[in-house]
Amino acid sequence: MSATWTVTGSAAFIVGSGAGGNETQTGCDNERTGCDNADSISKKVQIEGITTGVVVDYGIKDAMNMGAAMAPAACELIVNHLSDFGREASYYDRIVTGDLGSVGQKILIDLCRQKGVDISKNHEDCGMKMFDATNQNTGSGGSGCACSATVLSAYYLPKLRSGELKRILFVPTGALLSPVSFNEGESVPGIAHGVVLEAVM
């Protein structure tokens, strides 16, 4: 099932120019952050690099299948990023997309394989992390820009700060459509950009 559930949420991030230092985090919750003791070092997270994406249109017209519309743009971004930086997919602990959902994830992995890139072992999607699709019957997963914002802030950043993850390629995904373009039967182009987030040791 390609249908998704729209996520309502928001998050804000402060980006500074100073390197700063690591902070002592007291009374940390093992389940939340994965730290092993009561006093743990909370690492800073830095933006190590970015890749600007391009609009990709595969002619998808089904507004209930946004994962299929956005997956080609995510693939283009990931492949271009790895080529530009001279890296393998395994360089990242996780390659995280925004809201492709389970259907879009399969398409993305297949498209990347066709271009000689295997992300099957370390790809995750914020839309899939948002819900328990089996128990909540949420189809392909969550959709909307809130997926990227909330899951990054509440799930991935804590894992980077605790040291559980060292480096991720964060790829928020978007679909370019409006009620007018949908009613006129236009295709839905996709877009994705990439940000490398790295824990400062």
Model-derived segments and their meaning:
Residues M1-V79, D84, K121-M128, R167-T173, ...:
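Condensing-enzyme catalytic core mediating Claisen C-C bond formation in acyl metabolism
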Residues S40-S42, G67-A71, L82, D93-M201:
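Claisen-condensing/thiolase-fold acyl-transfer catalytic domains that form or cleave C-C bonds
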